[in-house]
Amino acid sequence: LASGTGFAPIKALLEYMLHKGITRPAVLYWGGRRPADLYLDGWVREQLTLMPHLPYVPVISDALAQDNWTGRTGFVHSAVLQDLPDLSGHQVYACGAPVVVDSARAAYTAVAHLPPEEFYADSFTTEADKHKDPA
């Protein structure tokens, strides 16, 4: 699960899987506000020829008419729940904005039965996050 530039650590995982010949079942969900936020979409699609066992689900939350987006829409962490409502027996690697990572962790463990110890995350803090008032 990647949101925006949180794809960078996920890309490293994909490269490792390819290098080591790992073919275990995995699905890549990558979300952005606009299609241009999926800045390495072409690279991902090229890798799919080498990793045919890896489904790729790009999800856009705020596409504009001029984007001509015809793919999945909504929040990327919600797309996972729609496709995989039971995550027991799975592992999740989530990277991106804290709100996405935190929302995914909460939903997957509370609703989709993901064991908390199977949720691995690397969230990044933006300038906007740094200026928020702590609750």
Residue ranges and their predicted role:
Residues 1-7:
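Short, glycine-rich nucleotide/cofactor-binding loops
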Residues 24-135:
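Reductase modules of NAD(P)H-dependent flavoproteins
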Residues 9-19:
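Histidine-anchored nucleotide/phosphate-binding helix
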